[in-house]
């Protein structure tokens, strides 16, 4: 029984002045691709044995609602696909940044920014890999709450 308040997508956003330009979508073809991917579809397909069927997929909102909690993040976050978080902020479309991805999963800012190599040197992690890390992560607050519950059950 979780009694806390959910964190909305709008609450985890960086100030627009801190968001690098590469996260803003200005390419019309990319925006149209997102529109298609997030829209409803009925596509005739043929299986490997020749059986024809209709693949159907319901539509999603054109962009993520900033007043709702973020959806589940996948390792493909940040690429052009149906599951990527697409934001519409101040009349501009954009993707979430690695810091926002960390916040969405309840990690500290820049948690994934650097890594230690086997030779001991510290190197920067690419934004793509940072998004992959967060798509592969569990929301830390949820894990913590599960741990508290298990401890409580063991004590009783």
Language model regions located:
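C-terminal target-recognition/interaction regions appended to catalytic cores
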Residues: 1-156
């Amino acid at each position: 029984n979780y009694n806390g308040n959910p964190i909305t997508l709008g609450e985890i956003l960086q100030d627009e002045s801190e968001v690098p330009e590469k996260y803003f979508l200005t390419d019309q073809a990319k925006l149209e691709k997102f529109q298609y991917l997030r829209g409803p579809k009925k596509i005739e397909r043929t299986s490997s044995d020749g059986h024809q069927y209709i693949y159907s997929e319901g539509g999603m909102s054109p962009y993520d609602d900033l007043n709702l909690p973020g959806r589940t993040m996948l390792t493909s976050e940040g690429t052009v696909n149906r599951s990527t978080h697409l934001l519409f902020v101040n009349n501009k479309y954009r993707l979430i940044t690695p810091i926002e991805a960390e916040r969405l999963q309840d990690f500290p800012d820049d948690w994934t920014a650097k890594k230690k190599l086997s030779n001991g040197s510290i190197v920067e992690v690419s934004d793509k890999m940072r998004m992959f890390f967060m798509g592969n992560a569990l929301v830390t607050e949820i894990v913590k709450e599960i741990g508290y519950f298990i401890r409580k059950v063991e004590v009783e």
